[in-house]
């Protein structure tokens, strides 16, 4: 399964913020430049992450963004479910768009659904804290100050 850029960017933002010193504010420009991501795309991602409570945004001079909750409380499977807009990995997953003639008797849909559930179950085992256990290495690659 391929994640959308939106979900990929969401996870990257969370990793970036988790690698920062606790309470430290970051900004969209800094994250966009670090990952070579469009600021416009990133603003949409951060807005949604804020709505979900994963990030806290502080407006005004001296403002920025930081994690809105402890990395231990941010479940990766949950983030993926809330940021992916389509888990219909084949046509027959969507009853409104399914034109496949063998769909009523085909076993593929059930196998793929089982695989999708297993994929999400693995992601459910991990938190953001698990993804930044090597925080010092991440900080070096992101060129952050320790």
UniProtKB/Swiss-Prot annotation:
Any one GO MF term held by the record is: metal ion binding
- Provide the residue ranges listed under DNA-binding region in this record: 28-51
Please indicate which superkingdom the organism of origin belongs to: Bacteria
For this protein, the record's Pfam families field holds: Rrf2
PROSITE patterns hit by this protein: HTH_RRF2_1, HTH_RRF2_2
Tell me which Gene3D superfamilies the record gives. Winged helix-like DNA-binding domain superfamily/Winged helix DNA-binding domain
Positions with a binding annotation for [2Fe-2S] cluster:
92, 100, 106
Q: Which residues form the signal peptide?
A: none
List the cofactors. Answer: [2Fe-2S] cluster
Which terms under GO biological process does the entry name? regulation of DNA-templated transcription
Q: Which NCBIfam families match?
A: rrf2_super
Its biological purpose is as follows: Nitric oxide-responsive transcriptional regulator. It represses the expression of flavohemoprotein hmp and the nitrite reductase nasD. Probably plays a role in the up-regulation of the resDE regulon in the presence of nitric oxide.
Protein name per the record? HTH-type transcriptional regulator NsrR
Source organism per entry reads Bacillus subtilis (strain 168)
Q: Which gene encodes it?
A: nsrR
């Amino acid at each position: 399964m391929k994640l959308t850029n939106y979900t990929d960017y969401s996870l990257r933002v969370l990793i970036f913020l988790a690698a920062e010193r606790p309470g430290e504010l970051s900004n969209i420009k800094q994250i966009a430049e670090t990952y070579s991501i469009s600021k416009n795309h990133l603003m949409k991602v951060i807005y949604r992450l804020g709505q979900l409570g994963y990030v806290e945004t502080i407006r005004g001079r001296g403002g920025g963004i930081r994690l809105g909750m402890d990395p231990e409380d941010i479940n990766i499977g949950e983030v993926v479910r809330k940021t992916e807009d389509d888990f219909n990995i084949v046509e027959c997953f969507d009853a409104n768009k399914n034109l496949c003639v063998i769909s009523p008797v085909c076993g593929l849909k059930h196998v793929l659904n089982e695989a999708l559930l297993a994929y999400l179950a693995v992601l459910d085992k991990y938190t953001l804290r698990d993804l930044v256990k090597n925080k010092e290495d991440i900080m070096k690659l992101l060129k952050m100050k320790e």
